[in-house]
């Protein structure tokens, strides 16, 4: 398990403890993974990101401490990469 003490604020950094990475979810269904992430770290929101999506949260390069991108494949919606905060 990977834990970090980071919370983004517009004026600086505050700390909290929460899970930041979910390698065990690679190969699972995206919706199941998103629900697990939301349950295990209430400070973040999981966003499903299929290939070639136009969803803004999936296409930006900004780092956000309250978002976890869940990259899924087109066939079956299976998680293809370790979901991490950012």
From Swiss-Prot:
Domain of life: Eukaryota
UniProt-annotated site: Reactive bond, residues: 61-62
Pfam families the record matches: potato_inhibit
GO biological process per UniProt: defense response to fungus; killing of cells of another organism; response to wounding
Alphabetized InterPro entries for the sequence: Prot_inh_pot1 (IPR000864), Prot_inh_pot1_sf (IPR036354)
Annotated signal peptide: none
Molecular function GO terms recorded: serine-type endopeptidase inhibitor activity
Temperature note: Active between 10 and 60 degrees Celsius. 84% activity retained when heated for 30 minutes at 80 degrees Celsius. Incubation at temperatures above 80 degrees Celsius rapidly decreases inhibitory activity.
PROSITE patterns associated with the record: POTATO_INHIBITOR
Keyword annotations of the record: Antimicrobial, Disulfide bond, Fungicide, Plant defense, Protease inhibitor, Serine protease inhibitor
Cystine pairings recorded for this chain: 8-65, 49-58
Field pH dependence: Optimum pH is 8.0 at 37 degrees Celsius. Maintains over 90% of its inhibitory activity from pH 3 to 10.
Function noted in UniProt: Serine protease inhibitor which is active against trypsin. Displays strong antifungal activity against a number of phytopathogenic fungi including M.melonis, A.cucumerina, A.solani, C.glaeosporioides and P.capsici.
Family: Belongs to the protease inhibitor I13 (potato type I serine protease inhibitor) family.
Protein name, UniProt field: Trypsin inhibitor
